[in-house]
Amino acid sequence: MAASSEEKVSLRTWVAVLGTVLGAFMAVLDIQITNASLREITGGIGSTAVEASWVSTSYLIGEIITIPLTAWLGRVFGVRLYLLVNVSLFLVFSGLCGTAGELTQMIIYRALQGFTGGVMIPMSFTVINTQLPPSKRPVGLVLFGITATLAPAIGPYIGGLLTDSYGWPMVFYVNFIPGVVMLATVFFAIDPQPLNMPLLWKGDWLGTVFMAIGLGSLIAFLEEGQNQDWFTSVFIQRCFTLAVIFIPLFIICELVSKTPVVNLRLLRIRNLGLASAVNFLLGASLYGSVFLLPEYLEQVQNYSARQTGEAMVLIGLPQLLIFPFVPRLMKAFDLRLIVFAGALIFGGSCLLNIHMNPDFGGPQFQIGNVIRALGQPFTIVPLSALATAGLLREQQADGSALFNIMRNLGGSVGTALLSTMITQREQFHDFRIGERITPYDPYVQQFLSNQSIQNLQHSGDPAGALQQAYRMLQSSVQTNSFVMAYSECFLALGVILLLGSVTIWLCKKTKAVGAAAAH
């Protein structure tokens, strides 16, 4: 009977959970929603396409630095005050991003936006695990899971729709709607806590500096490496050097410090450490697939941002039908089995795309997207529960920061490797196909003859018609090379998810969620 009283959750607590989940959703969405509008933002701030990549990179740098700090600063200022200040600043910087007139301004505003927005992701996770009793946490984790899987899927659609209808600044101004709602819910639903300023002064400031330099350099290296041709760039060389030096220094500082900013010792807890490793692989697959599909549709099929977003929606919407069933499954089955099944389904959806051809467009991705949408809810939610099941209440904030930063790092590593893989494999296939194409090949002769006749009918210039036929042949070779490269990238994602599905069995078996509440 005691369990039933523990299971009662007040409306005020649910409002607090929903408010923080809304903030996490907004923070995750803010990457994909702007990626869909980079072309328009580039024109608005007068930058090149390569420079515009910093619109996303600067946000990710700010986010990756702040996530590890949330547990410490949350204890210093209290959850309520810490969230209120950061959400308010996030809205201020969102507004400034919409008014930016040149690249430097945009980079600064986006970095600060990421620094304040990144707070919302682990804090939402912490509120769920500290405010809800064990039997109700699956529901809270489902809500959190929506932010991790639904936001990246629908972000391109929302970004394309807002940009086409109202212009690119609206992708930043739209944050005011959920932001104000979150401010109200946090203000009224979370109790104020006393300040703990001595904890601020006793914090490991040296480790904080090492962490900021190391992780910031790592993200810059990963996100900008492909654009700047990796180690041929002095900037990329310096970023790599800083990351290699300062990340180990940060780890050493945290392990020897009596008051670490990030309690890395928690990773020795078997389930948290292994689940975080699986979360790294899941992040690489989740954000990698969100990166691959739009890139393919825009590069190979010449889709607009809005068309790409419409193709991505099918990844997001079916998840809303699946998520409500996840808590029941978590109460009935081994969490490892649910994650295993979800990873296999997700991986299978990627493997459906390994035999693409140049006619493979949005409609051909639909079946795979729906299957992917069916698998994703069964990965992130039970994996989150598995990671935090053995943590004490006072360890939840640090565990949340570690678990979530691994997904973000996985996403950055995954997209960087996939971006490089596309370029390298396209060049490889272009070379191999080119070896087989000779003027004496009957298929090549037939292609050139047919295209020359068609071109001649429009131009009336025999020499020009033949030259245009050669250009069309070259374009066809390049298109096929890209298609094969993208197919191999989807194969790589499938292998990564298979690896994650196997690794999850190394975790200790935990009681079905909700079983603990009965004791």
State where each predicted segment sits.
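Cytoplasmic helix-loop-helix junction between adjacent transmembrane helices
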Residues: 113, 117-146
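Glycine/proline-centered helix-kink
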Residues: 122, 143, 148-160, 164, ...
